[in-house]
Amino acid sequence: MASSMLSNAAMATTAATAGAQASMVAPFNGLKSFATFPITKKSSNDFSSLPSNGGRVQCMQVWPPVGKKKFETLSYLPPLSDAQLLAQVQYLLNKGWIPCIEFELEHPFVYRENHRSPGYQDGRYWTMWKLPMYGCTDPAQVLNEVEEAKKAYPSAFIRIIGFDNKRQVQCVSFIAYKPAGGL
C-alpha cells in the first residue's frame, strides 16, 4: 500500500514537471525561410564600398626576389658602416650578450643538399672564428676580429652573433661583411 502511494505521488510529480517543461520550450518548427529577410544584390562593377587606404597601394612595391637574397637581422638595410657596426656591437654588449664571429665560404644561405627535410648540414651553421669573446667589453675589439677574419678569408661572408649564456640562445645575428662578388 505504501509503495503504491509512493509511486502514485512520484507519477503525479513527474507529470506536473513534464507539463511545465512542455509549456516553457517552444516546439522546433524547422529553419526559418529567407522570405522575411530582404536580399539586395550589388552590381559586380560597384567598387564604392571596397575598403581603401587612400591611394597608397600605388606606392607599394614588392622586393625583387632575384639577385637580392637576404640574410638575417638588418639585411634589408644598406651595408652597415663601421660606426653602425660599432653601435650594434655596443648594443649587444650592453644587453650582456657574448659576441661571436662566424664565417661561411661556400653557401651563405640555407640550402638542402642531402635530404629534403632540414638537417644539421643545410647551411644554417657557419664556422666559428676563434672562440666566443667572453668578457669582451669593447666593441672595437670585436671589429678588429672581423678585420682579421676578412684578411684570412677575403671571399667569406662574416656575421656577428650575440649569444645569451644565461638563456643559452642566440639573440641577434647580422652580417658584418659581404665579399665584393657576394650575393
From Swiss-Prot:
Pfam families: RbcS, RuBisCO_small. It is found in: Plastid, Chloroplast. GO terms for biological process: photorespiration; reductive pentose-phosphate cycle. GO terms for cellular component: chloroplast. Keywords: Calvin cycle, Carbon dioxide fixation, Chloroplast, Photorespiration, Photosynthesis, Plastid, Transit peptide. The basic functional RuBisCO is composed of a large chain homodimer in a 'head-to-tail' conformation. In form I RuBisCO this homodimer is arranged in a barrel-like tetramer with the small subunits forming a tetrameric 'cap' on each end of the 'barrel'. Belongs to the RuBisCO small chain family. PANTHER family: RIBULOSE BISPHOSPHATE CARBOXYLASE SMALL CHAIN 1, CHLOROPLASTIC, RIBULOSE BISPHOSPHATE CARBOXYLASE SMALL SUBUNIT 1A, CHLOROPLASTIC-RELATED. This is Ribulose bisphosphate carboxylase small subunit, chloroplastic 1. It comes from Amaranthus hypochondriacus. The gene is RBCS1.
